[in-house]
């Protein structure tokens, strides 16, 4: 009888919150996620939460807030096919996303290089990795449940030699590859991205904590995107200050907030260095932030070369700096003959 991998079912074992690197790595291997207690101490938690709410309120006041998860909004569509004003309260948006937090406070930037989380990210991605996005989700009451998805949907699946491969540039967000029992003999991709979700208030079943499908990282498949979900998932429950780390192959989605208050999550997404980040830091970073950034932060923002990739000139430079005098078209002072001698 052929062995198979069954999807997680409600009531099956799940990780317990912990403060152990060893336990966290074990959880990541088996379940695809782990919950770290007290990732933010009390003072840091208050500082991050207050700065986030101040920024969020200011963006609403300025008319630039990104508001989604309304009943008639569908973020699974290709973003470049949607009008720019799709995600606003006027168009039914309920939750508020705050993007590009790297520019919006030192308390946010400090999380990019979190000392406890870094070894766990390195376990998944290796010693070289990039920040893909640093953002927040303020999930308000009334927001609808998000369809399940993975955060490395852009990875082509391993293909048998006799099948035509999927061209990488044709892959679309929200493609459905199937579910159910999984043949363990079929090859799957490694994790190439991961998420650290910092809980800025308690995540509960009632307020729509992120929903995950434990062990789905081993399926090698994209999840069915239906809402309500057609597979068993679990809403994350964690105390304020905790961090939920889950890898990029995990099936997950924002839960619906049925409480009477907002749920505040700050999400740091990382990817391997050969992949394109969601946020373009080399172009979008505030010059003052860049000038003050540590070498470690600059590396995670994509300013450090990786095996000569990301260069703007010399392939053996370590970091790229904004060129004040970029080299453009040049001609020698003299004309060169075919023999290589200069004409007088």
Which ranges hold each PLM region?
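Conserved double-stranded beta-helix
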Residues: 219-251, 255-344
